[in-house]
């Protein structure tokens, strides 16, 4: 039998599972890429991008996804599951590194649900189901916030009374697993050392940027929640708190309506009125679509300026995630607005998504490095085995 580990990443309507083979206590290869999603009234089940089945939703969707996976898993007699790894969005103040799951930790993480209400419940539901079904193996949690634990206090504090900071109302930062992968695998991918003062731009449906100094997170664009920072596919990004007060007092909106507005109806979708997909907006000639793209780029450029100030300089910018690693147009637009830094992009290399897309004469190096959150979780799991 072949020893494998399972990596789970759960969303509100989907579940991604990666099965990695291991050899000599190292992650060897990805054997299966499994994706389950809720689509209308059905759950669709994909293995290595091929649809295997579709079943009607009769009960809790996440539980049905796990059961559907387990039904398939029982037929994989050649594979021996020795551990699972799980992405948990929020680790709060106390979880600054991966941990082995037990009942006490699950209870502690449930307390953090108010800090990440749209992600944490589903992360924990999947974790708990695997923990209950596979009692004889280790289950390891990796947190999206842990990478930013090195941020100094000055970067974490809001201008609120200290009592709120003590209660955990502070800047945390997210997408940490992506930043950890890109920074730790940078040399093997690019054949260059990670420059001292680096900004990584994780640009996807959820987007953020991180200032990294000497390989460690210094600060990032996201703060208390995944709403903060740059504008995203359906999220607002930075927003004057007075806007929320106005929506409550004058628009008479409920908390549920405001949550829906800020998380699901804003960003690229809200500005364009057409789509949350950057690929669609780039090819659309409407005024609102163009404005949405321009605003997305503008907010990113402003954030890069803030992070350069925090770093007290800049040596390198790295683009990653769905938009960052695939959209030559967005990279060119951002780099163009940063030309005052002495950034020069090689048009041909940028179009081909090559790893280094800046010219030799560019004063700031610019790279494209695909992220791999599942692999970094798998590598963390192996440290416990």
Swiss-Prot record:
Whether Magnesium counts among this entry's keywords is yes
GO MF annotation: an example: magnesium ion binding
The pathway is: Metabolic intermediate biosynthesis; acetyl-CoA biosynthesis; acetyl-CoA from acetate: step 1/2
Q: How is the cofactor bound?
A: Mg(2+). Can also accept Mn(2+).
- Name the gene: ackA
Please give the function described in this protein's UniProt entry: Catalyzes the formation of acetyl phosphate from acetate and ATP. Can also catalyze the reverse reaction.
Where does the record say this protein resides? Cytoplasm
HAMAP family recorded: Acetate_kinase
Residues at site: Transition state stabilizer?
175, 235
Family affiliation: Belongs to the acetokinase family.
Subunit structure comment from the entry: Homodimer.
Q: Which organism is it from?
A: Rickettsia typhi (strain ATCC VR-144 / Wilmington)
What this protein catalyses is: acetate + ATP = acetyl phosphate + ADP
Q: Which residues bind ATP?
A: 16, 202-206, 277-279
The identity of this protein, by name, is Acetate kinase
């Amino acid at each position: 039998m072949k020893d494998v580990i399972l990596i789970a990443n759960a969303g509100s309507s989907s579940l991604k599972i990666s099965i990695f083979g291991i050899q000599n206590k190292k992650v060897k290869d990805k054997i299966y890429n499994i994706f389950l999603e809720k689509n209308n009234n059905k759950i669709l089940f994909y293995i290595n991008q091929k649809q295997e089945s579709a079943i009607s939703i009769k009960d809790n969707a996440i539980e049905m996804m796990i059961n559907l996976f387990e039904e398939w898993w029982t037929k994989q007699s050649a594979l021996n599951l020795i551990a699972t790894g799980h992405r948990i969005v929020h680790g709060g103040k106390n979880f600054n590194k991966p941990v082995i799951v037990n009942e006490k930790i699950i209870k502690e993480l449930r307390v953090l649900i108010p800090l990440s209400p749209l992600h944490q419940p589903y992360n924990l539901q999947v974790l708990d189901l695997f923990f209950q079904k596979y009692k004889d193996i280790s289950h390891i949690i990796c947190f999206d916030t842990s990478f930013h634990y090195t941020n100094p206090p000055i970067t974490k504090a809001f201008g609120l009374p200290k009592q709120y900071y003590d209660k955990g109302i502070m800047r945390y930062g997210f997408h940490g697993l992506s930043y950890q992968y890109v920074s730790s695998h940078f040399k093997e991918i690019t054949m260059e050392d990670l420059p001292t003062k680096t900004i990584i731009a994780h640009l996807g449906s959820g987007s953020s940027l991180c200032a990294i100094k000497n390989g460690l997170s210094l600060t990032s664009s996201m703060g208390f929640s995944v709403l903060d920072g740059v504008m995203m596919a359906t999220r607002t990004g930075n927003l004057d708190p007075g806007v929320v007060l106005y929506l409550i007092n004058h628009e008479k909106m409920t908390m549920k309506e405001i949550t829906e507005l800020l998380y699901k109806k804003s960003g690229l979708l809200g500005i364009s009125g057409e789509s949350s997909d950057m690929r669609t907006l780039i090819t659309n000639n409407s005024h609102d679509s163009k404005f949405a793209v321009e605003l997305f780029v503008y907010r990113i450029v402003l954030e890069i300026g803030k992070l350069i100030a925090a770093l007290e300089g800049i040596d390198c910018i790295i683009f990653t995630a769905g938009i960052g690693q695939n959209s030559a147009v967005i990279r060119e637009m951002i780099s163009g607005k940063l030309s005052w830094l002495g950034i020069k992009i090689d048009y041909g290399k940028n179009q081909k998504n090559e790893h280094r897309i800046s010219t030799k004469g560019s004063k700031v190096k610019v790279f494209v490095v695909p992220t791999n959150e599942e692999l970094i979780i798998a590598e963390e799991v192996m440290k416990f085995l």
